Every structure is written in structure tokens, then in C-alpha cells.
Curated annotation (Swiss-Prot):
Protein name: Ammonium transporter 1
Classification via PROSITE patterns: AMMONIUM_TRANSP (PS01219)
Organism: Dictyostelium discoideum (Social amoeba)
Name of the gene: amtA
Disulfide bonds: none
Residue numbers on the Extracellular membrane side: 1-39, 98-127, 182-194, 255-265, 315-316, 373-392
Reported consequences of knocking out the gene: Shortens transitional period (when fingers and migrating slugs assess their environment to determine the appropriateness of that environment for culmination and fruiting body formation) of 1 to 2 hours and rarely forms slugs under standard conditions of development. Gives a slightly enhanced growth rate in axenic cultures.
Length: 463
């Protein structure tokens, strides 16, 4: 980072009344002679690990859905990756991490990654090249809206998915990420903490997922199956979950932006939290019948999502209790939403990601220690109960923003191109209706051969 940019940045932050820690980021960058090779290597490896989480998410979700919708979820996620990558490179990074505009959003100074150096650091990451940080954060920006696909699976048109993903990323994710990670109002003025995305990613996506599930309504035969449609390929789902688990170490420990004690602590917290949450799910599922595969993998994902915001701020021993709380809360949230309220969040995104992200973010207010991460704060257990209120402010602000805008975007998209497929198309499956393909060629059309022909003849890609 050149001297002029450093001076300009420090002056702007002082003028805006930023905390000394925010100003210090610029000074740390100025004092850094060159990016550290070891830290740069770790962040680049973490970037690759988080990228791998996205096809892993596709495997996980495809295996849990019905076979006639396998390719649709894979196509949504893989298409989302490339669209969101282009957006981030063109303007997303700049809106998120560009110079702050009244605490709300960045500007377009770094559009198309202009002046994002491959040689010098950035204030957000004083030990690595600015470009390495930009590409690492690209993966977070990419995966966030893709998490929502599990909530509305098997019901939403592909073009509606693309429209919602693009609009949601711009209106929800970029501002929220700026508020907490990019020098915006929640961190600058209140000190809201989110190590790797419990608020920015899991709360925003989880709350939005619930809104979408409510908006699009239940799938056909929801009551018949009690909300638990038979999965098509549990081994595929398990492989996806295992790859997600592995990638989560890059997600959480990579957020330390250095290969050191904070990254090590995040690795420990991630493994412990995910494991204890899974144990809770195994015990509860066994108590109701038999321990099943879906419970194991959902329990792991719930724990990993919930430990995400706290992993770099708390002693890893707290991950035991937090993991247990996350397992209990997510399990009974699924029972409440799906089996009591009959909300068809197909893959329980609101419970496994949303609720756990909220709990983990609030846990920072109790368990955070400056001795673990000097860039954080002490929580209530260490003499600072105000941090609980700070974290609550962050969670509520992001949840309300995400929920409100998601509903508005759905209404606009529905009024223009439509959101949901009709019931007869749902019967055939999105693989055929939206993409003209089958994942498995032994799928029965179940007496719908005539409708199959009409669907084929109605789509341009068969002409």
C-alpha cells in the first residue's frame, strides 16, 4: 500500500471518528515491509479450501434431495459460483472493502480490482498481498447466497434463482459485509465482532432462507412425507458433508489471515464444536428410533456453522458447551419449523445455518477473550457485559435487513418473471423441466409420459 493511500486512509478514519484499532490497521500495513510468504501461502490454501466447499455443498444438497432434482441444485450452485465471481471482481470487492461511504457501503475506487496490489498489503490484511485478501473474501461472498438454495430446493425457476442471487448479493450481502468487515457502522461505531461469518454469512443467509421458504410455500406431498422427503443418495450427501467439514478449516482458520496461534485456536474450536453438535444429533435421533446418517451430517454442519463467528475469539474449551447448545438448538428448531409449523425449508437452512449463526454470534458476547485474539474484545465472562448487547445489535440489524429485502426482492421477481414452478412441473422434477437432463437414467416418469413430451417441446433448448 503506497504512502499516499495510507495517509489518506488514516486521515479519513480519524475524521470519521473511527476507533484506534481501525486506524491501527493502516499503520500496521505501513510498517509491513513485504507480505509474509508463510501467511500468504496459508491464505491462498484457505481460499482453495473455501472454493471447494461450494461443489461440496452441491453434493451435500443433491444427495439429500429427490433424484429428479439432483442436477438442478448442482446447476444452481455451479452457475452461482461463476456469476458471483464476475460480480465480485467487477464491483463487489470495491463496494464491500472500498473507502467507506457514511458507514453504509464502500465506493467504486477498486472496481475491477483496480489498485488492488499483488505486492503490497491492505489495511484489512497487513501480512498478505491485498489481492490475496480480495480473492479469499471472494469465496465468502460466493458461498453466502448459495447456502439459501437448500431452503427453496425443488420449487424455484432457474432464472428466478439467478435474479434473486444477483439482487440479494448487491442489496443484502455487500452492505452487511461492509458494516462489519469493511469499516462500516456496526464495527466502526459499536465494535460488533464476527470472526468468519456467523452474522455476515450464516445469519443473513439463514434468515433469508426462512423468508424464501415461507414465500414459495410447501412442496407437493409435504404432508404425506411429514416434510422428510426420501433422499436420493446418502453416500453423496455424506461425501459433500465431509468435504464441507474439511473446507471449514480454511473458512474459519483462514480468517485469521496468518498461520499462527489464532488460526490454530480456530482449527481446534471448529473441530470440537462440530463434533459435539453432531453427538447431540446422534443421541436425539437414536432416542426417537435409530441414529441415522442425516442426523450425523446435519449435526456436524450445525456445529461448524455456529462456531464460525466465535472460532477466532474464544478459548477452544468453550467450544464444548457451545457445540452442545448448537446441536440442541438446531435439532429442536427443525422439529419446530418443519414438524410443528409445517414450514418447508427443504434442507433446514434456517435451523442449521441461521439459528446456529445467531447463537454463535451471541456467544462471543459472553466468551470472547482478548488473550485469544487481541483484535477482538473481552466478553461478559471477562468483565465486559456490554459486548452481549453489541453482538445482539449486530444480529438484529443484519437479520431485519436481510429478511425485509429478501421479501421485497421476491415480490419484484414474482411480479416479473415468476418465482415458483407449477405443481405439474414439480411432479416431473426440475432436472427435466428446467435443464432437460436426468442425473440418473433409471428414473420413472410415473405415468407422466405425455406431460414429459409437452415439457420437452415447450423448451427452446430442445428445438
Amino acid at each position: 500500500m503506497v504512502a499516499g493511500e495510507i495517509i489518506k486512509g488514516v486521515a479519513a478514519e480519524i475524521t470519521n471518528g473511527s476507533s484506534s484499532s481501525v486506524v491501527q490497521k493502516y499503520l500496521d500495513c505501513a510498517n509491513q515491509v513485504a507480505p509474509d510468504p508463510g501467511n500468504t501461502t496459508w491464505v491462498l490454501l484457505s481460499t482453495i479450501l473455501v472454493l471447494g466447499m461450494m461443489p461440496a455443498l452441491a453434493f451435500f444438497e443433491a444427495g439429500l434431495l429427490r433424484s429428479k432434482n439432483t442436477l438442478s441444485i448442482i446447476t444452481q450452485i455451479m452457475s452461482g459460483i461463476v456469476v458471483l465471481t464476475v460480480m465480485w471482481q467487477a464491483f463487489g470487492y470495491s463496494l464491500t472493502f472500498g473507502p467507506d461511504q457514511k458507514g453504509i457501503i464502500g465506493n467504486l475506487d477498486h472496481a475491477f480490482l483496480i489498485n488492488v496490489s499483488y505486492d503490497d498489503c491492505s489495511p484489512n490484511a497487513p501480512n498478505i498481498p491485498a489481492a490475496a485478501y480480495a480473492f479469499f473474501m471472494m469465496m465468502f461472498a460466493n458461498i453466502t447466497p448459495l447456502l439459501m438454495t437448500g431452503a427453496f430446493a425443488e420449487r424455484v425457476k432457474f432464472k428466478a434463482f439467478i435474479a434473486l442471487t444477483v439482487a440479494w448479493e448487491i442489496i443484502v450481502f455487500y452492505p452487511v459485509a461492509h458494516w462489519i468487515w469493511g469499516g462500516g457502522w456496526l464495527h466502526k461505531y459499536f465494535g460488533v465482532l464476527d470472526f468468519a461469518g456467523g452474522i455476515v454469512i450464516h445469519t443473513s443467509a439463514g434468515v433469508s432462507a426462512l423468508v424464501i421458504a415461507l414465500y414459495v410455500g410447501r412442496r407437493k406431498d409435504f404432508e404425506k412425507y411429514g416434510g422428510e422427503f426420501p433422499p436420493s443418495n446418502l453416500p453423496l450427501a455424506t461425501i459433500g458433508a465431509a468435504l464441507l467439514w474439511m473446507g471449514w478449516f480454511g473458512f474459519n482458520a483462514g480468517s485469521a489471515l496468518a498461520a499462527g496461534n489464532i488460526a490454530t485456536s480456530a482449527v481446534a474450536s471448529t473441530q470440537i464444536g462440530g463434533s459435539f453438535s453432531a453427538i447431540v444429533w446422534i443421541i436425539l435421533s437414536a432416542a426417537k428410533g435409530k441414529p441415522n446418517t442425516v442426523s450425523v451430517i446435519n449435526g456436524v454442519i450445525a456445529g461448524l456453522a455456529g462456531i464460525t463467528p466465535a472460532s477466532g475469539y474464544i478459548n477452544s474449551q468453550y467450544s464444548i458447551g457451545l457445540g452442545i447448545c448448537l446441536g440442541l438448538a438446531s435439532y429442536y428448531s427443525v422439529v419446530l419449523l418443519k414438524h410443528k409449523l409445517h414450514i418447508d425449508d427443504a434442507l433446514d437452512v434456517s435451523s442449521v445455518h441461521g439459528l446456529t449463526g445467531i447463537i454463535g454470534s451471541l456467544a462471543i458476547g459472553f466468551c470472547a477473550e482478548l488473550s485469544v485474539n487481541p483484535n477482538g474484545a473481552n466478553g461478559a465472562f471477562y468483565g465486559n457485559p456490554k459486548l452481549i448487547g453489541t453482538q445482539l445489535l449486530g444480529v438484529v440489524s443484519v437479520a431485519v435487513w436481510a429478511a425485509a429485502w429478501t421479501w421485497v426482492l421476491l415480490k419484484i421477481i414474482d411480479a416479473t418473471i415468476g418465482v415458483k414452478i407449477d405443481e405439474s412441473e414439480e411432479e416431473l422434477g426440475l432436472d427435466l423441466v428446467e435443464h432437460g437432463e436426468f442425473a440418473y437414467h433409471n428414473i420413472s416418469l410415473q405415468g407422466n409420459e405425455n406431460h414429459y413430451s409437452s415439457v420437452i417441446n415447450s423448451h427452446d433448448f430442445f428445438k
